[in-house]
Each structure stands twice: as C-alpha cells, then as structure tokens.
Amino acid sequence: MAKASESLDLSVNESTDKALDRDCTTLSRHVLQQLQSFSADAQDLSALMNRIALAGKLVARRLSRAGLMEGVLGFTGEVNVQGESVKKMDVYANDVFISVFKQSGLVCRLASEEMDEPYYIPENCPIGRYTLLYDPIDGSSNTDTNLSLGSIFSIRQQEGDDSDGQAKDLLTNGRKQIAAGYILYGPSTMLVYTMGTGVHSFTLDPSLGEFILSEENIRIPDHGAVYSVNEGNFWQWEESMREYIRYVHRTEGYTARYSGAMVSDIHRILVQGGVFLYPGTIQNPEGKLRLLYESAPLAFLIQQAGGRATTGLVDILDVVPKKLHQRTPLIIGSKEDVAKVESFIQNGH
C-alpha cells in the first residue's frame, strides 16, 4: 500500500508540476523559447508580441463593456478605403494598435485595412526594423449582437529605407512573414500565433492580466466535418463553387458553421478540422478578403499547423500583391478538405 501511495503522490506531483509550468509560460517567455535565443532580435520580437497582446487586452476590455459605454456600438457614418461603412469599434481598435506601437520603438510602419496608406512613426523609423500589418477588428458587424470577433496580425521585416513612403517592400509573397496570428474575442480571449515553428495558443487570464500558454504545436486534422461559407452568396459564385456546395449538401457527414467573423470560424477549423471558403464571385473574381491583412497571415498560421490555404488555383503564400489593399479568394483549412474544393474549381476551369 505504501508503494501504491508513493506512486500516486509522484503522479499527482508530476501533474501539478506540468500545470505550474504551463501557468508560468507567458507569451513573452514562450516567444524566446521558440526562437531559442536571447539575442537582441529575439528580444525585439518578444517585445513586439507583447505589444500585440496589450492591444488585444485593451480591445477585449472595451468589448466586454460594449453595452455599457458610449462610442462602441454602431457606425461612424464614414466609409473606409475598401468602400465599407466603418463601425465605431473598427476605429477604436485601429487607434489602439497605433497607440500601443507608437511607444514600442520597434515598428516604423503600421499597415491596416482601415487606413488608405501605411501609418509611419517617425521617431521609430531610424531604429524600427519591423512592419505590423493587421486587421484591427475582423467581423465588426458582430459587435452589436454580442458575438465573437477577432484581430489578425502579421509581422514583416522592413527591407530598405522606404524613402519614398510607398512601402513597396511589402508587395512580396506571404513567405516573407516573420510571425502571424490572431486574437479571438469570445467566451475567453485567446491569442494564437506562429513564428514558423508550429502554432501555439494562449488564453488571457483576467486575474493575472497575462496570456498564459494553453496548447503548443497545434495540428489541424487532415479532414473535418465543418464547411464554413456564406451560402447567401450562392448565386453570385461560379458554377464550380456551386457544384461543391451541392456536393456537401448531398454527402453525409458534413455540417455548416458560419459566424460572420473569419477568426472565429478559422479557430473552430484549426481545432476540429474542416474548410473555410470565401470565394470570388462572377462580378468580383478577385474576392473580398485582403491578402496582406487577412488571407496571408491566416494562411501562414494554418500551413504551420499542417493545413493548406489557396485561392483555388495558387497557394496563398505564393501570391505577390500589386497593391497594399489587394483582395484574394480564400479556401483554407484541413488539407484533404481544401483539396476537395480545389478539385471542383480546377475541373471547372
């Protein structure tokens, strides 16, 4: 009995130690572990991720009080560079990212889908070697109905001095990304990121005010039951995409899930498997999603988890944009499910 008791004690202690290790693994510590370095570059990237986390905390706090505060719900009455009506939360979140990175000393430029041109921070530009590209609020239409939203981010190394202020060095493929990820504002606030060494998730512990490691080296299933697409656009798509939708309707084992916030849908697919689709339409074959701020960051992350991302014809990470706000179709998720969609599209061409 004594030996059995000792064995049980050891098992409990090991379990407790693992839980403590996880609880002590903050985002900044994890980044340094992933880079296996305490060099100046590694410290800079750790600081950058901390700044992104701070922006996420501020946005999460604002969203948690959305029904109690002025200036959170509804539209501003303005239209952004994409021709879309601007929500008040879009403006707030965009301003949060700018304010947070103004103080970092690490970022010279921020490029957002809410801004016509990159935002330069002159005092940072002599030393700031990085550019942050981001979608401050994904799914902002969900704000007024208290549904999940997200933020998407990508970090790139600045190339050249960008003396003409055109940010032409950003017009490169998605494989130039150093890091990418998203923040999900749901029942809990989660930050999921990759630096090219796997995909890792963190959950905001409100009592500590820290993002704590939830899961390391997440792998997306090769196949999943979920397909996530706005079927309200059915008659606007090419016939090949409509044929795919008819296929999943008549094939047992598929289930539709679509929230109106891509980050939320992508997170479900990362965990459960499946495919997210935002195809182009007959009138707008280039699609709706922004390559640099939405499609490429999520493609980098999903591919690091063992999934795939494509336009239907070309790997998303191989697409070279011709302009900052370039749009692209997106099919992303489990590799078998993405391949199935591709087969319909490519046969349709």
From Swiss-Prot:
The keyword Metal-binding applies. One of its GO terms (biological process) is fructose 6-phosphate metabolic process. Pathway: Carbohydrate biosynthesis; Calvin cycle. It is an enzyme of class 3 (hydrolase). Mg(2+) 2 binds at D135, D138, E294. It catalyses: beta-D-fructose 1,6-bisphosphate + H2O = beta-D-fructose 6-phosphate + phosphate. Its cofactor is Mg(2+). It is found in: Cytoplasm. Its EC number is 3.1.3.11. Substrate binds at D138, G139, S140, S141, N230, Y258, K288. Keywords: Calvin cycle, Carbohydrate metabolism, Cytoplasm, Hydrolase, Magnesium, Metal-binding. Binds 2 magnesium ions per subunit. GO terms for cellular component: cytosol. One of its GO terms (molecular function) is fructose 1,6-bisphosphate 1-phosphatase activity. InterPro entries: FBPase_C_dom (IPR044015), FBPase_class-1 (IPR000146), FBPase_N (IPR033391), FBPtase (IPR028343), Fructose_bisphosphatase_AS (IPR020548). It holds the Pfam family FBPase. Mg(2+) 1 binds at E113, D135, I137. Homotetramer. Belongs to the FBPase class 1 family. This is Fructose-1,6-bisphosphatase class 1. The gene is fbp.
